[in-house]
Amino acid sequence: TDMDKRKEYKPLIEELFKMAYECNKDYGIEGKLGLGNMWANINPTYSYNKTHTHPNSMWSGVYYIKVPKKSGKLFLEDPRPGPNTHMPRRVEGMPEALWRVCAYEPAEGRMIFFPSWLPHGVDINMNTEKGEKNWRISVSYNFIQL
């Protein structure tokens, strides 16, 4: 898409770049970044996004524009094969470092970044309001290292 070329998205893109460089800093990564691509997602009732990754990108993420109730959480999965081979019963309140999947409730104005290699998806939108009221609208993006 040409979203990154449109003036109405300039303030969002400026914030995305700030956050992308913060991610680089946190991970000890040097070098310039470019916005590889960005696109809008419109998810009506019963839509979802299967687990996937973003090859050839550095950072990926989502910015939530419209979020009706029960419209589906973003989930991030542990990519290591080992934790899938044995899933022992865990006590309640276990440390986050031991979680296999982390889920984030969408909220309007929330911006989430993650490494592009991290498997992720979106749970089913269970909001059944009529028409466009049930749409979850977000912008997704990929940053590349230049």
Language-model features: where?
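Non-heme Fe(II)/2-oxoglutarate
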Residues: 1-30, 48
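Amphipathic alpha-helical surface "interface" segments used
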Residues: 1-5, 37-42
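Hydrophobic, well-ordered secondary-structure segments
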Residues: 12-22, 100, 106-107, 128, ...
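A short coil-to-beta-strand element that immediately follows conserved catalytic motifs
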Residues: 28-38
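A short beta-turn/loop motif at secondary-structure boundaries
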Residues: 32, 129-131
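Catalytic core of non-heme Fe(II) oxygenases with the double-stranded beta-helix
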Residues: 43-113, 123, 132-135, 139
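Short coil/turn motifs at secondary-structure junctions
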Residues: 66-68, 121, 127, 144-146
